[in-house]
């Protein structure tokens, strides 16, 4: 019964993964119209419960009222530190109790100073930082 929000979804690989593992609902957000159309088409073909929305992430988060069990974000690696901070602040109010935020980022960025940080997991040049609030 997990509700997932996939931010900066791109072509939807993470969304498909969560949907294939039994997530009740996956919402994919990306600002690129072609990516959203691709996700919609693929989700329909694979009969997956994925809602794809074309939107800029930070404005979307600031207007969002739905709550989620898991939020995954794979933002551009050139984000400034304060944008990561703003993103975690906006997602904190959208997580259900015991909900988790996961941010994928470059290994040269240290997000451990951001409120809610719990751990890092390293995968080559990529790091997944976990947050709970």
Describe each PLM feature range.
Residues 1-133:
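Class I S-adenosyl-L-methionine-dependent methyltransferase catalytic core
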